[in-house]
């Protein structure tokens, strides 16, 4: 067994180590060999002293090494955590406080920012390690956390992406401890929400909204004596949370009403009803946002409306999606009304006021603003469905109707404007993802699928490549000549402008191709539609062509087929809808190298052969036993069975039987065929004696009837049509030569197959 490197050796190397050597020391500190109480007071104590010395150094590099060493040794060595974790946390906090002071006075360089990140991460890890450990939490964490929280709040003004995740965790897990700092933190978050919110990246925006929502977990309201009329009312634990959520919902109504200055709401009674159902602003409430001002002469001021709605929608999404320590009530009906109202703000169904229609620039801005407002409603719907699932399906008709308002159409037409759809590609991907979640849980309950068919057309169009220079080639020759005539210096070469020759020579290079992420989202939507709805032939053909062509293209270019395309091909094969032609051969040819189990089973079905063999053997043995025991009884039972079950005239019945002696065959075209002893046939009618399971064919007429009997002569009824047919009985004599195989004693009881006796009542009737 290999012995670990002594801790004292690692401690001596720690201060002077650089690069790979330092990483190697951290690797060895993870070893469980050092979790030994004997080493705690000797070598491990020396190591901790070395780490403390690094943290107290003025060198940024030494502080950085000390942070990583403290995190590793406390994470993998519980003895060090219990004995020295509190001291290490105290030293790290002191260095963090100094760095925060430096950051507030002036900006840090790249190395200083890296050290600041290491200090913040070290404090976060050490606090998580001490949490839920009674002794450490009581003696070190709780006393120290009251000093750590204000320092982190101060730093959150400058480094929100770094600090807000830690503060969010502290609010959630130490709500009571965080209460004194609630007001200070709310001021900073309000500043982020009202000023410069759009300058933050999407992840940081979500952190700001989550922290603002978590502030409502802290009970800041003082106890008020209730009167006799309200003293019996039940108080809910989420009362403060509900107040914060309703305050955000109430901010939407004034913004929707402000859009009434642009659109003529009197033309849409449904929207007027929706606005009436929205949460109103409370009389005593104060908004954290300033009032908006719009100037129709400055169209850019209209963008303040979607900007404010974007902030409110993200705040509301945090209120309904973040986990809480207690149960909260979500007003789904109010959320549905708000989302429907946002998606109803469109100039396609509600006309713009007459005095604003002449300004082309203003109208273009209005349409763009309304699209952004609608997208806020789509994101709210997506969060609702993702969080609450089937509970939201009671609003399914409202959701689909509201989403259908987002589809752009050409002017004065019901045709989809695919160019605008491509410009709204990011927004439509959210729509496809939302509809996929709904359809997967609704199944075949939808009756009106016109909206889904429109989405299929849009999705297929988004998968096509777009040429960036398409408009260049659409200019007419007349326009070119007109432009040339206005040019003064026709023959003078413009050296300041580059050549446009590549546009004509290499036009295929100026294209926008669909990325794999878009394909994945669309394929999931197509799979949910195909699996849960029966589409018409036109849509199924388009989807099959798209899946086969794109999958084959990826296979040729990348050497493999993406997973979502394999799932789409599988769904098209298993769920063909009303189609009778399968794409299985083409799908198997495309993904034959992927070793897909489903296609392998469909291409090579495996039957339970052992079970089939045992059934065949059992049937044969039972037939011989019955024949040996009581052949006459067996024949009578068979005859009665077939008499009770007439054979249809239009079918061919083949019956195996065994001939021990020459038999007579009476062919009755009306009802039955009887076999009698003592009648033989000539050799020209029957060739030779044949083994069992073969057939003899006797031609009686052009219409053939095949029958098979087993073991004994029996009477077999032949089905007769509803018409009454009168015809005399004809006899056919059959001679069976049993002497041709005298040397084979074991074949005396062999089965013979008699050719089908062809009976034709139609021919006799014609005569």
Swiss-Prot record:
Q: Does the keyword rRNA processing apply?
A: yes
State the Gene Ontology terms under molecular function: chromatin binding
Enumerate the residue ranges of region (Disordered): 699-767
Q: Where in the cell is it found?
A: Nucleus
List the InterPro entries hit by this protein, alphabetically. RIX1_N
Superkingdom, natural source: Eukaryota
GO terms for biological process?
pre-replicative complex assembly involved in nuclear cell cycle DNA replication; regulation of DNA-templated DNA replication initiation; ribosomal large subunit assembly; rRNA processing
Q: Where mainly found? A: nucleus
> What residue spans carry the Acidic residues bias annotation?
742-752
Q: Name one GO cellular component term.
A: nucleoplasm
**Entry's Pfam families?**
RIX1
Provide the alphabetized UniProt keywords.
Nucleus, Ribosome biogenesis, rRNA processing
Asked if rRNA processing is a keyword of the record, the answer is: yes
Q: How does it assemble?
A: Component of the RIX1 complex, composed of IPI1, RIX1/IPI2 and IPI3 in a 1:2:2 stoichiometry. The complex interacts (via RIX1) with MDN1 (via its hexameric AAA ATPase ring) and the pre-60S ribosome particles.
Q: Which PANTHER family match?
A: PROLINE-, GLUTAMIC ACID- AND LEUCINE-RICH PROTEIN 1
Summarizing the function annotation, the protein's role is: Component of the RIX1 complex required for processing of ITS2 sequences from 35S pre-rRNA and the nucleoplasmic transit of the pre-60S ribosomal subunits. Regulates pre-60S association of the critical remodeling factor MDN1.
Family of the protein in this entry: Belongs to the RIX1/PELP1 family.
Q: What is this protein called?
A: Pre-rRNA-processing protein RIX1
Source species: Candida glabrata (strain ATCC 2001 / BCRC 20586 / JCM 3761 / NBRC 0622 / NRRL Y-65 / CBS 138) (Yeast)
């Amino acid at each position: 067994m290999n012995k670990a490197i002594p801790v004292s050796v690692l401690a001596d190397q720690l201060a002077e180590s650089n690069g790979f050597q330092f990483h190697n020391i951290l690797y060895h500190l993870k070893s469980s060999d050092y979790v030994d109480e004997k080493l705690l007071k000797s070598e491990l104590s020396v190591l901790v002293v070395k780490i403390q010395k690094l943290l107290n150094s003025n060198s940024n590099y030494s502080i950085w090494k000390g942070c990583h060493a403290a995190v590793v040794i406390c994470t993998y060595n519980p003895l060090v955590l219990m004995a020295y974790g509190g001291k290490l946390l105290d030293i790290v906090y002191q260095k963090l406080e100094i760095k925060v002071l430096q950051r507030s006075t002036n900006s840090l360089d790249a190395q200083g920012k890296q050290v600041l990140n290491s200090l913040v991460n070290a404090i976060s890890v050490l606090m998580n390690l001490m949490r839920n450990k009674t002794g450490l939490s009581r003696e070190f964490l709780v006393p120290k956390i009251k000093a750590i929280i204000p320092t982190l709040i101060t730093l959150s003004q400058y480094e929100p992406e770094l600090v807000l995740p830690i503060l969010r965790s502290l609010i959630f897990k130490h709500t009571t401890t965080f209460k004194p700092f609630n007001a200070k933190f709310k001021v900073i978050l309000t500043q982020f929400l009202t000023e410069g919110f759009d300058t933050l990246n999407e992840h940081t925006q979500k952190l700001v909204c989550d922290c603002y929502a978590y502030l409502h977990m802290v009970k800041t309201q003082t106890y008020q004596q209730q009167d006799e009329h309200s003293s019996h009312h039940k108080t809910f634990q989420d009362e403060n949370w509900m107040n914060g959520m309703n305050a955000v919902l109430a901010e939407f109504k004034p913004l929707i009403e402000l859009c009434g200055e642009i659109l003529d709401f009197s033309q849409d009674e449904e929207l007027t009803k929706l606005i009436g159902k929205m949460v109103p602003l409370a009389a005593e409430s104060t908004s954290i946002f300033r009032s908006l001002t719009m100037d129709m002469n400055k169209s850019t001021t209209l963008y303040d409306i979607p900007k404010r709605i974007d902030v409110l929608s993200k705040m509301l999404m945090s209120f309904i999606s973040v986990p809480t320590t207690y149960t909260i009530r979500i007003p789904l009906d109010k959320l549905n009304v708000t989302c429907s109202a946002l998606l109803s703000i469109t100039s396609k169904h509600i006309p713009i006021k007459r005095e604003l229609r002449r300004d082309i620039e203003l109208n273009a801005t209005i349409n763009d603003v309304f699209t952004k407002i609608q997208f806020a409603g789509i994101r709210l719907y997506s969060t609702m469905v993702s969080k609450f699932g089937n509970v939201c399906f009671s609003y399914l008709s409202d959701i689909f109707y509201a989403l259908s308002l987002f589809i752009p159409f050409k002017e004065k037409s019901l045709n989809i404007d695919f160019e605008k759809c491509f410009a709204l590609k990011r927004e439509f991907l959210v729509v496809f993802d939302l509809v996929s979640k709904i359809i997967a849980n609704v199944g075949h309950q939808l009756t009106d699928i016109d909206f889904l068919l429109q989405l299929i057309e849009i999705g297929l169009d988004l998968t096509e490549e777009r040429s960036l220079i398409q408009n260049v080639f659409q200019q007419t020759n007349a326009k070119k000549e007109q432009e040339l005539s206005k040019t003064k210096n026709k023959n003078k070469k413009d050296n300041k402008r580059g050549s446009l020759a590549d546009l004509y020579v290499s036009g295929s290079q100026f294209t926008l191709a669909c990325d794999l992420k878009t394909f994945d989202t669309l394929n999931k939507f197509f799979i949910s539609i195909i699996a849960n709805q029966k589409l018409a032939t036109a849509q199924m053909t388009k989807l099959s062509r798209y899946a086969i062509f794109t999958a084959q293209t990826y296979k040729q270019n990348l050497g493999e087929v993406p997973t979502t395309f394999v799932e789409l091909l599988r769904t098209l094969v298993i769920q063909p809808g009303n189609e009778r032609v399968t794409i299985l051969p083409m799908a198997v040819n495309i993904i034959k190298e992927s070793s897909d189990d489903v296609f392998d089973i469909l291409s090579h079905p495996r039957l339970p052969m052992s079970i089939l063999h045992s059934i065949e053997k059992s049937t044969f043995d039972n037939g011989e036993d019955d024949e040996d025991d009581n052949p006459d009884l067996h024949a009578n039972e068979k005859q009665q069975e077939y008499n009770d079950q007439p054979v249809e005239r239009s079918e061919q019945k083949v019956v195996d039987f065994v001939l021990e002696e020459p038999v007579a065959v009476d062919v009755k075209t009306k009802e039955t065929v009887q076999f009698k002893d003592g009648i033989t046939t000539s050799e020209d009618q029957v060739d030779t004696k044949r083994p069992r399971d073969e057939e003899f064919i006797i031609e009686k007429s052009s219409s053939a009837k095949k029958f098979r009997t087993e073991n004994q002569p029996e009477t077999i009824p032949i089905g007769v049509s509803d018409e009454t047919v009168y015809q005399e009985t004809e006899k056919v004599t059959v001679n069976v030569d049993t002497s041709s195989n005298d040397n084979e004693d074991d074949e005396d009881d062999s089965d013979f197959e008699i050719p089908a006796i062809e009976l034709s009542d139609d021919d006799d009737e014609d005569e």
